Amino acid sequence: LVILSFSKPVFADTISTGGGNKIHFINLKSKSGSDAILLESNGHFGLIDMGEDYDFPDGSNPLYPDRWGISRANEDTIEDRLFRHLKQVGVKKLDFILGTHVHSDHIGTADEVLKRYPVDRFYLKKYSDERITTQWRLWDNLYNYDNAVRTALERGVTLIQDISDQDSHFKLGNMDI
């Protein structure tokens, strides 16, 4: 008996920048704006943003209320697509992950990435919603931020939240970050 299993391929835009360096743009090509960027150099990998996930607060905790605008639609999530692409590329470990900002469509899947892959460093600014001018744009940002930070600490990942000049430049394989 032979059982064949095929996974759905992920079509990501990939740019080769020379010297074995690649940049993979993984997005939904939808209205949500959820995306992820995988950097690859000499067998080293880094992930910038992790996109929206399937997890959202149910409103039972007053710290994480159920709000209008929280993404609950499967077409707005990138979680499955991200993990399929990481597997297709052969990622076993991430040197770093970086959340560009704390909106759920950029860090929603961070806790799942931290659970599935060894990660050396996690760059994520401290949570602040002071520049958000309307309550509906708060979405489930704090919920996803707290999940990501908690998971990083549980996994022993170096969490860098105050990015100094020393932290802001480093190597990923042959790539200067």
What kind of region is each of these model predictions?
Residues 1-5:
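Bacterial N-terminal signal peptides
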Residues 7-177:
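Non-globular, low-confidence helical/coil segments that flank catalytic cores
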